[in-house]
Amino acid sequence: MCSHSQRVLPKRIILVRHGESQGNLQPTAYDTIPDPKIQLTPEGIAQARHAGHRIRHVIAGEGSTNWRVYFYVSPYARTRSTLREIGRSFSRKRVIGVREECRIREQDFGNFQVQERMNVIKETRQRFGRFFYRFPEGESAADVFDRVSSTHFFFNYCNGFLESLWRDVDMNRLNHDPSDDLNLIIVSHGLASRVFLMKWFKWTVEQFELLNNFENGEFRVIQLGSGGEYSLAVHHTDEELLEWGLSPDMVADQKRRASASKGDWNDPCSWYLDAFFDHLPDSDDDNVDKHDETDSLSECS
């Protein structure tokens, strides 16, 4: 077993959305079927199986023979079925293990979802804002963000999924041989995957709301770059990132991460600076101080 000082980082973290479900094909299915019990359609099964082939090609395509996979899966029927189909592409010796993880489940839309009511609710969400709007008797995207990352509930500290994932890696709970490339595959839902990316890359709410949802059976590859930073741009093209809704600044940030040295790279966070400090002058502190003194004198005269 690896000691904490021998921490071996995953080479890839792959986020997968489930295949087409009954609810995707016919939204009225939610009127009578609980969301966690919604099944895949035949097309969804085919999409999931194809995703497995493509994911294996991503992992094995670089020529390495020393690689293993570990799966995390949402407890919903459609994600569990997606995992079973993806798993057909991997032999048992390649799979370290699998864990059902409730914190990466679908956003709670409020029990049975009668379509006439949901249409009104979703129109209200568009006006209110997709991230902060909380469905009646359900969750907001911000609530999903909290359980995917971490949060405090009164005096009880609740670990988010991402925090638990890193603790698994740190303590080698995955029983991973450090000589093998480790690939973590997270089979989940569109929103849970997008807030995972938001947390990972420290994106703002405004940036999150630019993102397009994953297609059914689609995946994103977060891969370790040459300098030790994770990035979407190691595997994916600029065109793909733009198509998924990333702004040009966000794409440029991913490209920096892909080649930056972990010790030298600092997050420039230009979007934070521009959002909060666009009114500040570019001159040095001395000139700013003199300007402030002049303003003070003029106010006193």
Q: Which residues does each PLM region occupy?
A:
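Phosphate-handling substructures
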Residues: Q22-Q26, P34-Q39, I86-W166, H235, ...
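Short active-site segment of divalent metal-dependent hydrolases/proteases
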Residues: S21, A192-S193
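Beta-strand elements within well-structured catalytic alpha/beta cores of enzymes
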Residues: R12-V16, Y72, P178-A192
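Residue-level recognition of the N-termini of beta-strands and the immediately preceding loop/turn
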Residues: N66-Y70, V95-R99, D180-L184
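Acidic, low-complexity terminal tails and accessory targeting/binding regions
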Residues: M1-R12, D31, G61, R88, ...
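Structured beta-strand/turn binding interfaces of compact recognition modules in eukaryotic regulators
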Residues: E43, S74, E101-I104, I222-G225
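Active-site-proximal alpha-helix that buttresses catalytic centers in soluble enzyme cores
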Residues: C2-R94, E137-D143, V148, S301
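Short beta->alpha junction loops/turns
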Residues: Y76, R105, H189-G190
